[in-house]
């Protein structure tokens, strides 16, 4: 695998994982308030 392809895959996975995580964090913070 090329480094470019690997980098793109890692960035894609990070975005896919961080999306729901950010939403969950916001929901938890709103619930605490």
UniProtKB/Swiss-Prot annotation:
Subcellular location, in the record's words?
Plastid, Chloroplast thylakoid membrane
Q: Does the keyword Electron transport apply?
A: no
- State the Pfam families in the record: PSII_Ycf12 (PF05969)
Q: How does it sit in the membrane?
A: Single-pass membrane protein
Q: List keywords of the entry alphabetically.
A: Chloroplast, Membrane, Photosynthesis, Photosystem II, Plastid, Thylakoid, Transmembrane, Transmembrane helix
Annotated membrane-spanning segments are 5-25
Give the superkingdom in one word. Answer: Eukaryota
Record-linked InterPro entries: PSII_Ycf12_core-subunit
Q: Which GO terms describe its biological process?
A: photosynthesis
Is the keyword Chloroplast in the record?
A: yes
GO CC aspect terms: chloroplast thylakoid membrane; photosystem II
Name the job this protein performs: A core subunit of photosystem II (PSII), probably helps stabilize the reaction center.
Query: Quaternary arrangement and interactors, per the entry?
Result: PSII is composed of 1 copy each of membrane proteins PsbA, PsbB, PsbC, PsbD, PsbE, PsbF, PsbH, PsbI, PsbJ, PsbK, PsbL, PsbM, PsbT, PsbX, PsbY, PsbZ, Psb30/Ycf12, peripheral proteins of the oxygen-evolving complex and a large number of cofactors. It forms dimeric complexes.
Report the sequence similarity comment from the record.
Belongs to the Psb30/Ycf12 family.
UniProt name for this protein: Photosystem II reaction center protein Psb30
**Organism phylogeny:** Eukaryota, Viridiplantae, Streptophyta, Embryophyta, Tracheophyta
């Amino acid at each position: 695998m090329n480094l470019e392809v690997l980098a793109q895959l890692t960035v894609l996975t990070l975005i896919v994982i961080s999306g729901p995580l950010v939403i969950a964090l916001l929901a938890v913070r709103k619930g605490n308030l």
